[in-house]
Regions:
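A short, basic/flexible loop-to-alpha-helix module at the beginning of a structural domain
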Residues: 47-63, 217-226
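Active-site-proximal substrate-binding core of FAD-dependent oxidoreductases
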Residues: 380-386, 398, 402-447, 564-566, ...
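Predominantly flavin-linked oxidoreductase catalytic cores and closely associated redox partners
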Residues: 169, 173, 178-341, 399, ...
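C-terminal auxiliary extensions adjacent to catalytic cores
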Residues: 443-499
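N-terminal Rossmann-like FAD-binding beta1-loop-alpha1 element of flavoenzymes
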Residues: 64-92
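N-terminal FAD cofactor-binding segment of flavoenzymes
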Residues: 85, 96-145
Length: 601
């Protein structure tokens, strides 16, 4: 990773010229702009503009029974279950990371219920799941102190007894090995850039493995058009705000009648700490400072083995103040006396960030569509109070595999797997989400204190099988929740000390992030004039603050401000696609293998 001074950046000027340019490329407008015609084609493709004005390249095709996009816990569970049901079923898993696990970032405290169902003997199979939770602690933080909340005051579902502290990336690497042993084909480094549509309008496959476009989108000397991977069914397990999932949700109106999806930004570091301060199996969650009234969110500190701890911070993206900087809130959190004492004398070894779905039951779209399904976080199956979704992701993969196997056994293909959607809503996943459905909207409306009191009460009553509140709505999307800058005071953050807190570019260097600079920018602007002409005067252009990797900058020049996109820094969190108040930024996949390379996240 290099900073903007040594890497190709995309620069957008004001509307007086409406010009987008790259410092190394005269035609960079093609690399970032999505015109009105392309914007109206929701559900066809959102690849770079240059490729859309050319004829489609000729591509070879490979056919499978099931094509799975994403080698996360959901996609790999589906692949394994399909092969368990019928070893003759052909299954391929496509992963955009350089290896399985490279793009996986999660807390993570794993509820093993999904894995128990998928691989009951996982404990004897060498799974990298070896640190059981031994202690739960909950704290309310003030700026200078903390109050521990008695465990007995917490709803039973917040108890982590029987769960495990894991590196989800390593769990996925292990699951991929088990899938391959069963005959699943797993291809890392394969970004899925387009959907292949069937003649009847169903999802028939995906385009994967396109490489070698120039910055302006035209084919370069070593251009590879990729392949069409066609399936009787296509499972989308891309994770939060997946680029293909987003198209499918719009095309088939899967969110019609649902509440807007809500999101958080999760940031995580791995620290090696003093053995005297380490307590393997301890799980700590905090609320309150430094966010307090500015936004919802909280932290986690998980003590795994080898004197390491996961230190994480989540900021709900429905905050109103465009001056808020989620990354700096995380860095400030580590200076709390309780946290600083834990980390004193330690060493940070990794950093990453990823959006989290938080809408829950009210926002869950229809999960089946003609030709495929949405798995796990692509649909939004996270239990927000528990900060857990991996168990539901695994269960969704199992349900999808069973529904597709039943359909193919009956000679069906390309239809809507209604039994999958029913299994998600009426089974363990639906019950898990329904119990906590009101916590997030209570927090969003009335703040932390109300969420602890009223939300906690609602979780208690739901444990008993009823709710006095019914089902509360979310109202605005996170983008719509952003208010004009004139209504808020700018937030002054302390400078990082280089010991506990760090600047964004330094942190990105701890994520292993890398992008080939000669490719088109994967962060598209529907209208290149909006950042400077609208977002800057109205919202003080929040992209320069909400991005946890320093991708976006507003640089003052003699002839006016410029909007700069340092796409090489992108850690694929998707926050820009979610939080941009004008919904002008569209996150698309870069070349396969690019992005972060998380070792043990």
């Amino acid at each position: 990773m290099r900073d903007r001074g040594g890497a190709r950046a995309i620069v957008v000027r004001a509307a007086s010229g409406s010009v987008a340019r790259g410092c190394n490329c005269a035609c960079a407008a093609h690399a970032i702009a999505i015109g009105p015609e392309q914007e109206s084609q929701q559900g066809s493709d959102m690849t770079d503009t240059a490729s859309q004005i050319q004829d489609k390249p000729e591509r070879e095709a490979m056919e499978y029974d099931v094509v799975i996009v994403g080698a996360g816990p959901a996609g790999l569970s589906a692949a394994i279950r399909l092969k368990q049901l019928d070893p003759e079923i052909s299954v391929v898993v496509l992963e955009k990371g350089s290896e399985v696990g490279a793009h996986i970032l999660s807390g993570a405290v794993l509820d093993p219920c999904g894995l128990d169902r998928l691989l009951p003997d996982w404990r004897e199979m060498g799974a990298p799941i070896t640190v059981p939770v031994r202690e739960d602690r909950f704290y309310m933080l003030g700026e200078g102190g903390s109050v521990r909340i008695p465990n007995i005051a917490m709803p039973p579902l917040m108890n982590n007894h029987g769960n495990y502290i894991v590196s989800l990336g390593n769990v996925c690497r292990w699951m991929a090995e088990k899938a391959e042993e069963l005959g699943v084909e797993v291809f890392p480094g394969m970004s899925c850039s387009e959907i292949v549509w069937g003649e009847d309008g169903c999802v028939a496959g995906v385009v994967a493995g396109e490489f070698g476009r120039n910055p302006d989108g035209t084919p370069g000397p070593g251009y590879e058009p990729g392949m069409e991977l066609l399936g009787k069914y296509v499972f989308l397990g891309e994770g939060v705000r997946g680029s293909l999932s987003k198209q499918v949700i719009e095309r088939f109106a899967l969110s019609e009648g649902r509440e807007p999806q809500k999101y958080g930004l999760g940031m995580k570091e791995i620290w090696e700490i003093d053995p005297a301060k380490h307590s393997e199996g301890r799980v700590v969650h905090t609320m309150g400072w430094p966010l307090e009234k500015n936004a919802g969110g909280g932290s986690f500190i998980y003590h795994l083995d080898n004197n390491q701890v996961y230190v994480g911070f989540v900021v709900h993206l429905g905050y109103a103040n465009p001056y808020l900087r989620p990354y700096q809130e995380f860095q400030r959190f580590k200076h709390h006396p309780m946290v600083a004492e834990l980390l004193k004398g330690g060493k940070r070894v990794a950093y990453g960030a990823r959006a989290i779905t938080e809408g829950g039951w009210q926002s869950l779209p229809k999960t089946a569509f003609p030709g495929g399904v949405l798995l796990g976080c692509a649909a939004g199956m996270v239990n927000v109070p528990r900060i857990k979704g991996n168990h539901n992701a695994m269960l969704s993969g199992i349900h999808a595999a069973e529904a597709a196997h039943e359909a193919m056994s009956a000679g069906r293909t390309g239809d809507v797997l209604e039994s999958y959607d029913a299994a998600v809503r009426e089974g363990a996943i639906g019950r898990d989400l329904k119990k906590v459905r009101n916590v997030k909207p209570i927090w969003s409306r009335w703040g932390l204190t109300a969420s602890m009191a009223l939300g906690g009460f609602d979780m208690w009553t739901n444990t008993l099988g009823f709710s006095l509140l019914g089902t509360l709505g979310h109202g605005k999307s996170d983008a719509e929740a952003t208010e004009p800058a004139k209504d808020h005071a700018e937030i002054v953050y302390p400078k990082p000390d280089g010991v506990l807190s760090f600047d964004r570019l330094t942190s990105v260097s701890f994520s292993g992030t890398n992008h080939e600079e000669s490719q088109p920018c994967h962060l598209k602007l529907k209208d290149p004039s909006i950042p400077i002409d609208r977002n800057l005067p109205v919202y003080a252009e929040p992209a320069q603050r909400y991005c946890p990797a320093g991708v976006y900058e507003v640089v003052e020049k003699d002839d006016g401000p410029e909007f700069v996109i340092n796409f090489q820094n992108c850690v694929h969190c998707k926050t820009c696609d979610i939080k941009d108040p004008s919904q002008n930024i569209v996150w698309t996949v870069p070349q396969g293998g690019d992005g972060p390379n998380y070792p043990n996240m």
